[in-house]
Amino acid sequence: MNLQTLLSMISNTSSWSISTAIIMVICNLLCIGLGRYAIQVRGLGPSIPALGLKGFGLPELLATTSLGHIIGAGAIIGLNSIKIIN
């Protein structure tokens, strides 16, 4: 398979815009909010004093924002494929 065939199979994705950023921020905030109450064993790693959340440390923040980025990327690709954002 040559490179031109592979490139033709890849869908055209949107460039970075303010709507893309807003979708990613919303997805991350939703996952942080859900993770705050859904994570049962928390507070085992270093805490983040700037947030002021008891028992919500660095491992929990990394886990929830990782999930937020996965959901955000899926939402951006999905909304781009049905032409809601471009």
Swiss-Prot record:
Domain of life: Eukaryota
Intrachain S-S bonds: none
Residues passing through the membrane, by range: 15-35, 57-77
Name listed for the protein in its UniProt record: Photosystem I reaction center subunit PsaK
Biological processes, Gene Ontology terms: photosynthesis
One GO CC annotation: chloroplast thylakoid membrane
Pfam families given in the database record: PSI_PSAK
The keyword Transmembrane helix is annotated on this UniProt entry: yes
Keywords: Chloroplast, Membrane, Photosynthesis, Photosystem I, Plastid, Thylakoid, Transmembrane, Transmembrane helix
The species this protein was found in: Gracilaria tenuistipitata var. liui
Subcellular location field: Plastid, Chloroplast thylakoid membrane
Family: Belongs to the PsaG/PsaK family.
